[in-house]
Amino acid sequence: MLDINFIESNLVKVKEQLNKRSGDYSLIIDEAVELNVQRKSILKEVENLKANKNNLSKQVGELMRNKQSDEANKIKEEVTLINSKIEKLDDSLKLVQEQLTSKLQNIPNIPNDNMPIGNDDNDNVEVRQWGNELIKKHNTPHWDIADKLKLVDFEAGPKLSGSRFVVYTGLGAKLVRSLSNILLNLHTSKGYTEITVPLLVNPQAMYGTGQLPKFKEDAYITTNDQYLIPTGEVPLTNLHAGEILDLNQLPIHYTTYSQCFRQEAGSAGRDTKGLIRLHQFNKVELVKITNQESSEAELQAMVNDAEAVLQLFNLPYRVVELCTGDVGFSSSKTYDLEVWFPEQNKYREISSCSNCTDFQARNMQTRYRDANGEVKLAHTLNGSGVAIDRLIAAILENYWDGEKLILPTALKPYFDNKEYID
C-alpha cells in the first residue's frame, strides 16, 4: 500500500498520477486523508488525556504522602473518568485505523512518471521485437496439435475438475517436466536461488503482495482460510516479510517452479480452448528484493532474463511497455513479453515483469539497513520466467510442420535426442 503521509504531503501529484490509471481515485484518496486526520486527532486527544492522567497521578501520590486522602480520592475519580475516555477513544482509534487501512488497500501503486499514458492494452507501447514472425502453410491451433500428438487430454480435465482444467499425458507430461527443468537451470545459472514453495498461503501473505483484497474473487480459498497461490510471487516475496535485511544481502534473486491457481473471474468466453487460460497452470517465477536505488536497473535485467527463455527456444516475441491504464494494481512499471502465435496471427502474453517499488514491502514490512544505518523499505520485483503452459502452446504452433512437431534444440536431450514427435 501507499504511505498515507506521502499521500497527504503530495496530494495533488498523487491524484494526478493515480488518475492516469483506468479509474478515478480522487474520492477514495480524499476519504483516506480524512480518516487519517481523524486518526491523528484521536491520537492527540489520547496523548493529552494521558499527560493529564500522569499529572493527576503525581498529585495523588503527593496528597497521599501528606495524608490528604479525601482530596486524593477525588482526583482518583477524575483519573477513572480519564481512563474511561481513553478506553473509548482507543476503540474509536481502532475503528478509524481499520477503515483507513481498508481504503489504502484499495488504492493502487503510483505509476512511474516515464510510463506511457493510456486507458487499456491498446495504448501499450512496443519496445522491441526479436525473431521473425513465421508465416506458415500449416497454421494449426495448438490444441489440435496437442490432441493429435496425444500430449494433452482435454476431456479428462473437465471430467475430473470442470472447465479450464487439462491433463497432460505421456510425452506431454514429460514436456512440462522438461521445460520446468530447463527454465530453472537457465535462471539459476544467472544467479537466481531456486526455492520450492508451499502452494497454500495464509491471508497475510496475499495481503502482502496485494492480491487481497482487490483480487479476492479470483482466488481459491480453502475451508481453513488459506489460499491456493495464484502465482509463485506470493510465497517468494513474502519470505522476508517482517525482516530488516543487511545491505550486503541485497539484491536477493529467487526463482521457483510451481502450479498456480486462478478463478479467472471476468474471463468468461475468452480462450475457452487450449492452454492459454487455465484455472490450474504451471509457471516458473522470478522475484527480486532490492534496495531503492537499483530496482529500475534490476527490472531491465529481469526482462532480459525472461527474454532469454524465448531466445533459447528461438520463438519470435516482442517486449511491450504497459501504459498507465493497463499496469497491474501493485506495479509501478511493467513490461510484458508477448510470444508469436502463427495460427492466431498475433502476439500473446507469456511473461509480465514488474517493479512494485516499496508498495508490497510496506504491506510486508520488508526493510533493509542502508550504508548510513538508516532503515528503509525494500523494493520488490516479480516476473514470469515463463508461463509453461503458454510456452508449450507457442512451441506447438511455431514448430509444427503439418505432420509432426520438430523439437527445439534445447528440448532434444530430454527426448532421447529425437528430432521430432509424431
From Swiss-Prot:
Pathway: Aminoacyl-tRNA biosynthesis; selenocysteinyl-tRNA(Sec) biosynthesis; L-seryl-tRNA(Sec) from L-serine and tRNA(Sec): step 1/1
Residues engaged in binding ATP: 262-264, 349-352
GO cellular component: cytoplasm
Biological process (GO), any one: seryl-tRNA aminoacylation
Domain comment, as recorded: Consists of two distinct domains, a catalytic core and a N-terminal extension that is involved in tRNA binding.
Assembly and oligomerization: Homodimer. The tRNA molecule binds across the dimer.
Protein name: Serine--tRNA ligase
Gene for this chain: serS
